Amino acid sequence: MLSGILIAALLMTLWGGWQPDIAHASDEFDALRIKWATLLTGGPALDPADSDIAARTDKLAQDANDYWEDMDLSSSRTYIWYALRGNGTSDNVNAVYERLRTMALAATTVGSSLYGNADLKEDILDALDWLYVNSYNSTRSRSAYNWWHWQLGIPMSLNDIAVLLYDDISAARMATYMDTIDYFTPSIGLTGANRAWQAIVVGVRAVIVKDAVKLAAARNGLSGTGIFPYATGGDGFYADGSFVQHTTFAYTGGYGSSVLETTANLMYLLSGSTWSVSDPNQSNVWQWIYEAYRPLLYKGAMMDMVRGREISRSYAQDHAVGHGIVASIVRLAQFAPAPHAAAFKQIAKRVIQEDTFSSFYGDVSTDTIRLAKAIVDDPSIAPAAAPNLYKQYAAMDRAVLQRPGFALGLALYSTRISSYESINSENGRGWYTGAGATYLYNQDLAQYSEDYWPTVDAYRIPGTTVASGTPIASGTGTSSWTGGVSLAGQYGASGMDLSYGAYNLSARKSWFMFDDEIVALGSGISSTAGIPIETVVDNRKLNGAGDNAWTANGAALSTGLGVAQTLTGVNWVHLAGNTADGSDIGYYFPGGATLQTKREARTGTWKQINNRPATPSTAVTRNYETMWIDHGTNPSGASYGYVLLPNKTSAQVGAYAADPAIEIVVNTSGVQSVKEKTLGLVGANFWTDTTQTADLITSNKKASVMTREIADERLEASVSDPTQANNGTIAIELARSAEGYSADPGITVTQLAPTIKFTVNVNGAKGKSFHASFQLGEDTSGPVDPGEPELPSVIVDNADSAGVTRTGTWKTASTQTDRYGANYLHDDNAGKGTKSVTFTPNLPIAGSYEVYLMWPAHFNREDAVQVDVGHASGTTRTAVDQRSGGGVWHSIGTYEFLAGSGGSVTIRNDALGSPDGYVVADAVKFVAVG
């Protein structure tokens, strides 16, 4: 307890010199404060007749009323709420301020039944006074129990309350509250999400007290570690779209979403003011949406594999979090440069409309509802196309495949990234959520919502290989071989060298992601722990009755709960989904398998996985079908292989099993490889630094490689060092002949025939995929001069010192990896019809040349980019669609050219597509033909 003398001193501080509110002259700070208040409440123009806004304000008023009724308002009180007694416990004090913030919102939001309620406001202010004396003042330690509450959580709530009730708070009272915040959070010096929270605390307080120096410091804080600049280690956003917090945890949908929200709000607040952000690195924020969030959002849900310990929070399930991220995208759309604002609106509209499970408007603020409805109701805004991609997040050991109708997330760990986070009594059963876990999303949008995490068997997470019934400790792994390769942003291969030291369990695990199938391989599975080892094929939440139909090899299986089965000679399985269509799953087992299955009702509580005070302890029950492969006790060199076939009917799965599109090339502890015959794809993971071959691919080092052969004319290849530890090169040989090529910097082609040979310099590449494209055909010229493409094939890159002429202002960018060379040019989606880039080759001989273009693709590109080819007979105009096909050469025809520099290719930014988009100029290739 505080001494009587100290209490008196604090009261004198609070009330000394008390005076009624002073009418200050309106200035820019007042405008910013009102802008922040509008962000919180929707402002005076909020339409209470709108049904979604009314539902939100009704809920707000109900929550506030419930809190108000439960308050202890007595003069002798020793707490504000009995349930949150314990005034020195930081989480309780933080929760008290959060409740008072809710009450302040109800008192100041148009349409709330408590709007303008003077008694409510007075009780809030009395509670703040009591808290100042008893809980939150400058005599407190800044870090007792949990520093986050004192320095970030409580100040954010108190700032908002001060803005909302600004006209009801005396100058003396306000100074006391603001001085306390300044005591706990005087400056900005942390990283990642914590830095963003510091910036918003300092910034909003600066607006309230009209401190220009502190407001500038808040703005400048965004330019620090873990926010605007891309991280190269530790916390923050990475150039590949990864987000890491606490040094080793993948957190795009957890701390990353907080960085996004807080940064978007502070940038919005300052936009158009004296303190608006001018740091050029703010452009990275726009890329967060494209690279970090668009691939990881599925129909309103944020993928759980990047939410860390937050998956154990009952109030923050995947759709609620996804809606919060979309709310931040809506906020960014209010002030981002026009092309990005337009793209953000399209993305937001698509996600809001396609989430048929949970209403977006039920999870966001009244102001966000107002802004989002303006987007959704605008017929001139077309929803963005659904993602169709494969993306490797090398910096956080994650990968994602998105296809129309389904998505698959893959969560791995390594010496760089930890398996799971469990601190502050949260995520107590997260053991295998990042240990080779697969997350399959389809039209069953409730799969990972509605109490999945407290009820799923946490020892059997899909995709994992485990010692049966045993947990693993949180931490980084013992092997650096985790990662994969992306080919053309559409296909990929990933792998993990698994080792659980506690159980002497090791395995090599790979996943090959093609168009509508995911192939999972395991090899070298060994253990001496005396515990059964198993690989979990799936653990799917079923419908409410638990009676989803399922078949094995076409024969119906029991749908009774509590039934466990051993199925032998299984070639394929089909499991009916929880929706009328779009949620069935097929499983194909090449060569057959013995499958263990269990259908059961599972009961659990959120409290069992999150032991925080406010976590509900009510039991919930859900039904599951679990399938796994039993490798036996103390296996040595065991293996497995299966194929996931999302959204296929039973008949389609049976037909696939009879004539599979995939072929397992090899599955050993040295190399794992799969061929997709219909697409011409071969993927291979090489596990050792010895020369090994898989199909057409030979590698001399640890590597992940994927190739695609297109119509016997072109061979695309991508290579990465998933270990991120090779400080030299990888030598690749492909059993094909070529007559020309293009390649990323870092690739040196040494031979085109009778086989293709090249090396990849992966020193410092940090898991990046390197791309090369080969024009197939016979070559008789012998070895290629390293570093120079074989003539007569000439490439002109935008970065070349000669042969490139710009008209108008073009910006240089390097964000996208499906580019040629170090960077590319874009027109900033401005000055349409006034800009061009002309590529002029110096051709060694006269004759016919086939002309190719390469560009980094993006959905915000122009779909009809005008291209003029200047040749010996005149000029020919053609058009290309830059929204897709990035990172590969596209032929635009064959033309006659004179020797020398008389020919050219001009890329124009005429606005002829619909809708208008960015135009990029990257590279042009001229290949002589016979």
Curated annotation (Swiss-Prot):
Effect in UniProt of substituting residue 246 to A: Loss of activity by 60%
The family this protein is said to belong to: Belongs to the polysaccharide lyase 8 family.
CDD domains for the chain: CBM6-CBM35-CBM36_like_2 (cd14488), GAG_Lyase (cd01083)
Organism placement in taxonomy: Bacteria, Bacillati, Bacillota, Bacilli, Bacillales
Pfam families linked: Golvesin_C, Lyase_8, Lyase_8_C, Lyase_8_N
Inhibition and activation profile: Activated by Co(2+) at 1 mM. Completely inhibited by Hg(2+) but not affected by other divalent cations. Intensely inhibited by NaCl and KCl at 150 mM, in particular by the Na(+) and K(+) ions but not the Cl(-) ions. Partially inhibited by iodoacetamide and N-ethylmaleimide at 1 mM but not by dithiothreitol, reduced glutathione or 2-mercaptoethanol.
Native source organism of the sequence: Bacillus sp. (strain GL1)
Protein name according to UniProt: Xanthan lyase
Major location (coarse): secreted
Keywords of this entry: Calcium, Lyase, Metal-binding, Secreted, Signal
InterPro entries (UniProt xref): CBM6/CBM35/CBM36-like_2, Chondroitin_lyas, Gal_mutarotase_sf_dom, GH-type_carb-bd, Lyase_8, Lyase_8-like_C, Lyase_8_alpha_N, Lyase_8_C
Keyword flag DNA-binding: no
Further remark: The 99 kDa precursor is converted to a mature form (77 kDa) through the removal of a C-terminal (22 kDa) fragment without any loss in activity.
